[in-house]
Amino acid sequence: LAADPQIAMYNEYFGGGMNAIVFQEMREARGLAYSSQARLIEPSHKDDSYMYFAFIATQNDKMKTAIEAFDEIINDMPESQAAFDVAKEALVSRMRTDRITGIDVINSYLGDREMGVTEPREKNIYETVQTLTLEDVKAAQDKWVEDRTYVYGILGDIKDLDVDYLKTLGEVQILSLEDIFGY
């Protein structure tokens, strides 16, 4: 939980929106994606782990190149002070105007207690994010993301996918629609 501010800033800088590194690299600079994102997802219980989620929507014939490019930026995060400044301002601005209302008030309270926190986590994140630097984001990426083992989920027509390449990433399990949806 002490890492919450760094992770929030990492998510905003690296994988959050159209100004984030993932979108800029995968879609704008390399033309490999219709859409893309990556983020660390916080656990819902204090004994659980964070989960890393990355997504790229690309053409089947660009799959190999897109996976390799995504792995490259995940393991060697591009650093841009200008992009960091934009991300930091966006996160601080959003937190400044966000409000927890309705049933979310009690859900937030209970969620914080479940995590062992007695004050709203948003307060700590808001106060700490304003002092973070690009080096802090890089440190979070080094600790939580870089050089990990990932599970890939590929959705597409098997006839159009390079299954031999997929086998180089690990065991390949081909699922039918019935396997996925149960009918």
Residue ranges and their predicted role:
Residues 1-12, 23-76, 82-134, 147-155:
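M16 family metallopeptidases and their MPP-like homologs
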Residues 16:
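Structured mid-domain segments that build the active-site/substrate or prosthetic-cofactor binding neighborhood
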Residues 23, 134-183:
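Proteolytic maturation boundary segments
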